[in-house]
């Protein structure tokens, strides 16, 4: 239905350990994939392999519903187009992810998305950690990623928080729809 309307879809996989299935999910038509609770470089490596076609990754060829395939009959041309167009996102939902953000934001990772509520659970579990707030974590990550290609996406939920995060350096905001 989204494809019929020309609306790109981003899909959040169900679990971090399902990163190996990204290629199969992308064959169904989403433009982007979001992986929850990423903390390990190995997860990022697995995601990159499954997301990108050779010679960047190892994604296999297939799926008539793939995003952007219509009108792109040449295998190499489509793979090149996809490797430049698809959107790979990692969710930053723990203090561990934040403190290793420079290792997780590898080339090919387009966006680091913030689940502030899950990150709050982890901050509450580590009350002695120097990061006390989600905003502390966002500021730290932005500093660590200066000059990197990966962008930070934040779920600010309402427009009244928009300027605060833009001023911090966040470039992608997710807000709840207005009634």
What are the language-model segments listed below?
Residues 162-178:
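Short, electropositive alpha-helical surface patch
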Residues 1-18, 23, 27, 49-61, ...:
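Alpha-helix-loop-beta-strand connector modules within alpha/beta enzyme cores
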Residues 26, 105, 163-167:
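Non-catalytic positions within long, well-ordered alpha-helices that form the structural scaffold/packing
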Residues 9-13, 33-35, 88-92, 112-114, ...:
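Hydrophobic faces of well-ordered beta-strands that scaffold small-molecule active sites
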Residues 15-17, 93-97, 157-159:
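Short beta->alpha connector loops
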Residues 42-46, 122-124, 179:
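Short, charged, surface-exposed secondary-structure boundary motifs
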Residues 20, 28-107, 116-118:
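Conserved anion-binding
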Residues 114-133:
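Glycine-rich, proline-tolerant flexible connector loops at the mouths of alpha/beta enzymes
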């Amino acid at each position: 239905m989204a494809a019929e309307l020309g609306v790109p879809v981003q899909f959040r996989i169900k679990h971090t350990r399902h990163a190996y299935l990204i290629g199969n999910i992308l064959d169904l038509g989403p433009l982007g994939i979001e992986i929850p609770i990423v903390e390990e470089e190995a997860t990022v490596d697995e995601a990159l392999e499954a997301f990108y076609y050779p010679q960047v990754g190892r994604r296999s060829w297939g799926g008539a519903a793939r995003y952007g395939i219509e009108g792109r009959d040449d295998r190499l041309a489509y793979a090149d187009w996809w490797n430049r167009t698809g959107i790979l996102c990692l969710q930053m939902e723990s203090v561990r992810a934040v403190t290793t953000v420079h290792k997780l934001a590898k080339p090919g990772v387009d966006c680091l998305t913030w689940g502030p509520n899950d990150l709050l659970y982890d901050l509450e579990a580590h009350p002695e950690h120097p990061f006390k707030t989600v905003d502390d974590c966002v500021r730290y990550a932005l500093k660590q990623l200066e000059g990197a290609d990966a962008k930070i996406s934040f779920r600010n939920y309402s427009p009244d928080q928009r300027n605060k995060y833009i001023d911090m350096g966040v470039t992608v905001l997710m807000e709840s729809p207005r009634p």
